[in-house]
Amino acid sequence: MYRIIAVDLDGTLLTSENKITKYTKEIIQILIQKKFYFVFASGRHYIDIMKIKDSLKINIFIISSNGSKIYNLDNNLIFSDNLDENIASKLCRIKYSDKEIITQVYQNDQWYINNNKVENNFCSLLSSLQYKYFYPDDLNFKNISKIFFTSRNFQKLHILKRKIINFYGNKVHVNFSIPGCLEIVSGDHLKGYGLKLIANLLGVSLKNCIAFGDGMNDQDMLKVAGKAYIMKNSDPHLKIALPHLEIIESNDNDGVARCLNKIFIENNKEML
């Protein structure tokens, strides 16, 4: 019997306008009342996810920065895995002067960027956090949970991905959350590890976990869950990597909520 529902946010639970629809909110509320545990698993900063959680007025587990930080139902940090300081220092410098690529950093409760080119459209629209500018020589590289590079020049990002993988190997995990956003976290602990930790904490088998995602940064979580679905709007590479998974409706068509309703609520329509 499924007890844990793990859901990615951008491209999965959230619409393209970064909103949660009324229908999705209703389904989540019903399942919370039915004693299901929700896990919001995202590349976003913890503060961003907390604001989404608070808007729903529910208690959930949080996996933030692609697994670097994990929080329990009481909003307490129960796991943390930051990037190696030397690696973080080099990554912050590698494309700092490239005007086509924005270097972005999550450190503790802060969000730093090297420049804000409006045409990249990957900054303030995706976050409720306020970013600050950073200079590599002035930044302390401790407690950096994630570094990510955003650009409209996808070819440059793919070249950068190969360069980072070739240089650092399994010391880091490098993947795209969306085509124009290349994310780097510690190589040891990802969303899948976070789901394992939470399931173990609750005494729930991974077989009783259900997961939803749309990006390559969701792949390991989708693999470890007992049941997993990918979105119609998913990254084509994810569909190729996990061809056995069922594809559900898109994030703009309440794909997650419709699937959950079909599985858990459809026989009790009077509840809706």
From Swiss-Prot:
Top-rank lineage group of the source organism: Bacteria
One Pfam short name: Hydrolase_3
Keyword hit for Cytoplasm: no
UniProt keyword annotations, A-Z: Hydrolase, Magnesium, Metal-binding
Entry cofactors: Mg(2+)
EC number: 3.1.3.-
Coiled-coil intervals, chain numbering: none
InterPro entries (alphabetical): Cof, HAD-like_sf, HAD-SF_hydro_IIB, HAD_sf
Active site, UniProt feature: 8
UniProt binding sites for Mg(2+): 8, 10, 214
UniProt binding sites for phosphate: 9, 42-43, 191, 217
GO molecular function: magnesium ion binding; phosphatase activity
PROSITE patterns the UniProt entry points to: COF_1
Position of the signal peptide: none
Sequence similarity: Belongs to the HAD-like hydrolase superfamily. Cof family.
Protein name per its UniProtKB record: Putative phosphatase BU028/BU029
Gene source species: Buchnera aphidicola subsp. Acyrthosiphon pisum (strain APS)
